[in-house]
Amino acid sequence: MTYKVENGAKFMWMGDLETDMQQEYYDTCKDEIPQIDILFQPHHGRKSGALPADLLKALSPKLIIIGNAPSEHIDYGDSQMTITQNTAGDIVFVNEENEVHIYTTNEISNKPICLYSKNGKENIEDEDGNVIYYYTGTLVV
């Protein structure tokens, strides 16, 4: 499923598609595959759902989100463009025109290189000053 925010990011969720079905999707629809900004990696990032290289190239995601899965089963791919929910916890996306500001419940130190720190963006705190979401970075789309 692909979702486009008006004047903003294009997201794709591939659910639990395993690699063979992804390859079939690519082979059947290769001329119609959209380029996207943020991909939720299929099958929670498990190796059994690893993206075929030709499909990944066609989609051209700027950022990949890997869902919760036991670490030994995850295919991290290019870890410089991924955020894993195992590390980040909950992830919140705030779309503002051509930027997506990303917040996570856990502070992450190994941030994807596609994210930059935007001046004025800060952690989100509750009324007692406790951080409830850490500002992780901004993706330009």
Over which residues does each language-model region extend?
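Binuclear metal-ion centers of metallo-dependent hydrolases, dominated by the metallo-beta-lactamase
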Residues: 63-141
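Active-site-proximal loop/helix segments of hydrolase catalytic cores
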Residues: 1-74
